[in-house]
Amino acid sequence: MSEQQKTNEAAQTLDGWYALHDFRTMDWSAWKMLSSDERQIIISEFTGLLEKWGAAQKEGNGSHTLYSIVGQKADFMLMILRPTMEELNQIELEFNKSKLAEYTIPAYSYVSVVELSNYMGSGDGDPYENPQVRARLYPELPDAKYVCFYPMDKRRSGDDNWYMLSMEERRNLMRSHGMIGRGYAGKVKQIITGSIGFDDYEWGVTLFSDDVLQFKKLVYEMRFDEVSARYGEFGSFFVGNRLAKEQLPAFLHV
């Protein structure tokens, strides 16, 4: 390996469950045309799907969560984690073939995989056998009151090209960046998913918290860190409130 190749060494990643963020807008006009009984049948069918998907979580083979999105970008977000891309696709198809999907309009989606990089160092032994690492690669999505999702890239322009930095430079920058996130431990749960080759951005960031203001505080503080200020490129932000299965009838009531 040449000196230049060593300098620009690619970060190695540990990869966990595959992730789908599926954002939908309700076609309320069409939904209102249904009778109350018809709507109840559709809600029951969707509730059954959620229960079916929940069985995988009980067996440790995935996780899912549902949030009502605030603003006009979407009405709700379904986030799914599964061991394989095929299983992710199967769930996507199950929902698309459901009666409820007939009254939704796709608003946005994001395909990625839960990721940990070697920027923060690694311990001895097989990391996939480390309980702490496994908990991060194969997480059970929390029942937090609020969610925030956004995609992001590392900048590749002029002197601000992340991919032309040496491994040592990137590792030092990410260590400082990570310390900010650690300051929100217990307040915000963060799941980073890699999407290079899977979607239009390079990473997806999903934040969970019981205090919605923590999203604003965390993202704002990170804007002053060099990783974000100099090298970060961000897509649209989506924020929402947890939509428990028991709340579906009220959410869909018209």
UniProtKB/Swiss-Prot annotation:
Chemical reaction(s) catalysed: Fe-coproporphyrin III + 2 H2O2 + 2 H(+) = heme b + 2 CO2 + 4 H2O; Fe-coproporphyrin III + H2O2 + H(+) = harderoheme III + CO2 + 2 H2O; harderoheme III + H2O2 + H(+) = heme b + CO2 + 2 H2O
Domain of life: Bacteria
Listed EC numbers: 1.3.98.5
Cofactor note: Fe-coproporphyrin III acts both as a substrate and a redox cofactor.
One GO molecular-function entry: heme binding
This protein's UniProt keywords: Heme, Heme biosynthesis, Iron, Metal-binding, Oxidoreductase
KW Ligase (keyword) present: no
HAMAP family: Coproheme_decarbox_1
Protein's UniProt name: Coproheme decarboxylase
Organism, as annotated: Bacillus licheniformis (strain ATCC 14580 / DSM 13 / JCM 2505 / CCUG 7422 / NBRC 12200 / NCIMB 9375 / NCTC 10341 / NRRL NRS-1264 / Gibson 46)
